Amino acid sequence: MKNLLFILAVAALLGAQASPAAAHSALLNCFDNADGTFTCQGGYSDGSSATGIRIVVRDSSGIVLQEARLDSNSEVTLNRPQGDFSVLFDGGAGHSVEVRGDSLVR
């Protein structure tokens, strides 16, 4: 019986380490302010702060138009480029998300 309890305890510990609940995804929402600017709010699915995360605005050919970092509220307001563009939340490997300019919430 003690061996069974030991095996179950070890299995539970190993299962907890491999749990997908420990993972988190990058989130980015961008809103058109209707004044020539847009605001993006970033974060992680587990509620972690995104303060200081790099935001990159690129045109349709990949040329960087603007770069900024999320403030202490995990937000940034930028000038809206003319033409097609995208906004990249650059949280590092596996933690990046991109929003197309034509999908900004108005």
Predicted features, each with a name:
Residues G83-V97:
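Short, aromatic- and glycine-rich surface loops/edge beta-strands on solvent-exposed regions
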Residues P20-F38, G43, S61, R100-V105:
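Beta-strand-rich domain onsets/edges
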Residues R54-E67:
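Short amphipathic beta-strand segments in non-cytosolic proteins
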Residues L13-A21:
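C-terminal segment of classical bacterial N-terminal signal peptides
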Residues T51-I53, F85:
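Short beta-strand/loop motifs in extracellular/secreted proteins, especially
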Residues D46-A50:
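A short beta-turn/strand-edge loop motif at beta-sheet boundaries
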Residues M1-F6:
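Positively charged n-region of N-terminal signal peptides that target proteins for export
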Residues R69-L78:
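Glycine-centered loop-to-beta-strand initiation motif
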